Amino acid sequence: MKIDLNADLGEGCASDAELLTLVSSANIACGFHAGDAQTMQACVREEIKNGVAIGAHPSFPDRENFGRSAMQLPPETVYAQTLYQIGALATIARAQGGVMRHVKPHGMLYNQAAKEAQLADAIARAVYACDPALVLVGLAGSELIRAGKQYGLTTREEVFADRGYQADGSLVPRSQPGALIENEEQALAQTLEMVQHGRVKSITGEWATVAAQTVCLHGDGEHALAFARRLRATFAKKGIVVAA
């Protein structure tokens, strides 16, 4: 069994360098919620050095709230903004001898695209326009995954080690109780259940079906690195290979 482990980079976390030794893919902030041209260049350089798959992490234009504000923008605006961000990172990667492999939207752009078909279509169209060989990463079972498949893109269905799930397989909003799993044992058990058995227990007790092709590891928690190391060790014991 194989699983991809991904993390978000270039968002001001001190643990970025060490996290890169534990993941197989990383998503680089492209300036709209965090980061800038210099951090993008630095992140690409480190990903190449560590043999980690390079990915873009485009967002709504929302630096003030770290890309977590809901927005209702015309699909053509989202298309242009997404193409702008991923095109910039693709060029930065190419200039350093690397290749951008995937795109994973950030924050509310990710969450809204999971449920809003028009938004999902705009993102998938931008990814396809940039490079049809790119992998589109989205919430397992979401509209974004469906849109990617409609454009013939390779998709990668994502699950979260430290997020609570609702009965329909969507994430519990960060504003609600149960959104974040802070107990390490619970997060580890949930991750193994999703990867090995394709299901997750919701906060209301029902089982939701999920297709786990990549696991998101957040690097900004107090015990994030320790958990990442433990998850890697657990996967090794279970014979689960970590690779992009």
UniProtKB/Swiss-Prot annotation:
InterPro entries: Glyco_hydro/deAcase_b/a-brl, LamB/YcsF/PxpA-like. It catalyses: 5-oxo-L-proline + ATP + 2 H2O = L-glutamate + ADP + phosphate + H(+). One of its GO terms (biological process) is carbohydrate metabolic process. Gene3D superfamilies: Glycoside hydrolase/deacetylase. Keywords: ATP-binding, Hydrolase, Nucleotide-binding. GO terms for molecular function: 5-oxoprolinase (ATP-hydrolyzing) activity; ATP binding. Its EC number is 3.5.2.9. It comes from the Bacteria. Catalyzes the cleavage of 5-oxoproline to form L-glutamate coupled to the hydrolysis of ATP to ADP and inorganic phosphate. HAMAP family: PxpA. Forms a complex composed of PxpA, PxpB and PxpC. Belongs to the LamB/PxpA family. This is 5-oxoprolinase subunit A.
